C-alpha cells in the first residue's frame, strides 16, 4: 500500500503535531519558509494510524495532511486548509 503525507507550507514550525503523534510519524526538518526555520515532515508515513491527533494539536488550524492510499483511494485526515 502506497502512502504519501503532504504537509503544506502553512506549517509554523511549532512542533505540536510532532509531539502529539503516538506513532512518531512526524518530525521537524529545516525549512527557510517560516519564522521558526523548520517544518513538519513525515518520513515514517507507513506507521500513520489516522488518529488525527496532529490535527487536534495544530494551534493554527492550517496544518494540511493528506494520506494517499494507492491510486484509487484518498483518505483525508480532516485537517483544515
UniProtKB/Swiss-Prot annotation:
Keywords: 4Fe-4S, Chloroplast, Electron transport, Iron, Iron-sulfur, Membrane, Metal-binding, Oxidoreductase, Photosynthesis, Photosystem I, Plastid, Repeat, Thylakoid, Transport
Domain 4Fe-4S ferredoxin-type: 2-31, 37-68
Subcellular location: Plastid, Chloroplast thylakoid membrane
Bound cofactor: record note: Binds 2 [4Fe-4S] clusters. Cluster 2 is most probably the spectroscopically characterized electron acceptor FA and cluster 1 is most probably FB.
Entry's EC annotation: 1.97.1.12
Residues noted as binding [4Fe-4S] cluster 2 in the record, renumbered to the chain: 21, 48, 51, 54
Enzyme class: oxidoreductase
UniProt keyword Metal-binding, yes or no: yes
Catalytic activity line of the entry: reduced [plastocyanin] + hnu + oxidized [2Fe-2S]-[ferredoxin] = oxidized [plastocyanin] + reduced [2Fe-2S]-[ferredoxin]
GO CC terms, sorted: chloroplast thylakoid membrane; photosystem I
Record-linked PROSITE patterns: 4FE4S_FER_1, 4FE4S_FER_2
Membrane topology: Peripheral membrane protein
Cofactor: [4Fe-4S] cluster
Pfam family, one: Fer4_7
Signal peptide: none
Residues that bind [4Fe-4S] cluster 1: 11, 14, 17, 58
One GO term of the biological process aspect: photosynthetic electron transport in photosystem I
Any GO MF annotation of the entry: metal ion binding
Quaternary structure, from the entry: The eukaryotic PSI reaction center is composed of at least 11 subunits.
Physiological role: Apoprotein for the two 4Fe-4S centers FA and FB of photosystem I (PSI); essential for photochemical activity. FB is the terminal electron acceptor of PSI, donating electrons to ferredoxin. The C-terminus interacts with PsaA/B/D and helps assemble the protein into the PSI complex. Required for binding of PsaD and PsaE to PSI. PSI is a plastocyanin/cytochrome c6-ferredoxin oxidoreductase, converting photonic excitation into a charge separation, which transfers an electron from the donor P700 chlorophyll pair to the spectroscopically characterized acceptors A0, A1, FX, FA and FB in turn.
Protein name per its UniProtKB record: Photosystem I iron-sulfur center
Organism: Phaeodactylum tricornutum (strain CCAP 1055/1)
Amino acid at each position: 500500500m502506497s502512502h504519501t503525507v503532504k504537509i503544506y507550507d502553512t506549517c509554523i514550525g511549532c512542533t505540536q503535531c510532532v509531539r502529539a503523534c503516538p506513532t512518531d510519524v512526524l518530525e521537524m526538518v529545516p525549512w527557510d519558509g517560516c519564522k521558526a526555520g523548520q517544518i513538519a515532515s513525515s518520513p515514517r508515513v507507513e506507521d500513520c494510524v489516522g488518529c488525527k491527533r496532529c490535527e487536534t494539536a495544530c494551534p493554527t488550524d492550517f496544518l494540511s495532511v493528506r494520506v494517499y492510499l494507492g491510486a484509487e483511494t484518498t483518505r483525508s485526515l480532516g485537517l483544515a486548509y
